[in-house]
Amino acid sequence: MFVKMKKYVFLFILIFAQSTLSWAETGVKPPLSYLEAMTQAHKKSTYELLYILQTEGDVESFRLRHTFMDGKEYAQLLNLDRSREEIILKNQTISYLGYNFRPFSLNTPHILDNLPNVLYADYVNLKGYVFLDSGKDRIADRIARVIRIVPNDNLRHSYTLWIDDESHLLLKSQLRSVDNAVLEEFRVLHLYRAKELELIASAIESLVLPALTSINIEALKSQHNWEVDWLPTGFNLIENQTMNGAMYKLENESIDSRLYSDGLSTLNIYVMPSQGVNFNEYAWQQGKLTILNQTVNDKDIVIIGEIPIQSAKQILQSIRFLGEAN
């Protein structure tokens, strides 16, 4: 009996070894490897993308030129529709240029506007999601590996990514609701790679860009003592501040603001004195954003985030007021 069992064990080990060897020979990598390669390619490659971004029926087209030279990142993101607006990335500085606003610069390492969040995630430390390889597809006349990022629950959105097999650049992404509706789609129409694109580094270096804008937010002490007892898996507090309500035309009032993120999605919770209108879980969806407003104990609570409405409601129900702050 023992000898027979050993034969079975040996057989299973042999089958496993053969399947592992076959997996290695095909060159198929685990999904995490594709995701890490994508983030590195976006940051350190030289390329030009013509792409569209679709959110809630609204479609805009863009051109992104990018290079990485001498340890520095350079990029130009140009809006191809309506009035000309562009964003310039020069190492750790982002400059916004356009005709309908005063140009300004911010100290930040990424272009976050009109690009999907999935490009900047730390996938090694991302919690509460599983990565699934869904095979190959063809996007913009290129072969792409399809990777799905699926939460372990129904309290966060899911993502599907199409990653170019050759360059590892993102060719397409979809942010999907718990009902599988597409909330946001990024799709490349044309990918161009050439050494000549490295010239944008010297072109950007020669530009006279707006001075860094200092955002002076008056440091105030919160008038409210409140806690959040529940958040979706992986969400952590990123920023906690109290702002002067005059900035938002709320005279002599302050607004508590807390920013949370799980590495892919973000949400904000605002608490302020009631403005005279009582809200009872007033909620709506605006593209990928959920907005929820409720009045509790003469205070207005507003939750805005890239999360399902049910998650926002659970967060709201978990907020506790512990009495007025001293």
Region spans (language model):
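Acidic/charged, solvent-exposed loop-and-adjacent secondary-structure segments enriched in E/D, K/R, S/T
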Residues: 96-118
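Gly/Pro-enriched, hydrophobic low-complexity segments
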Residues: 140-206
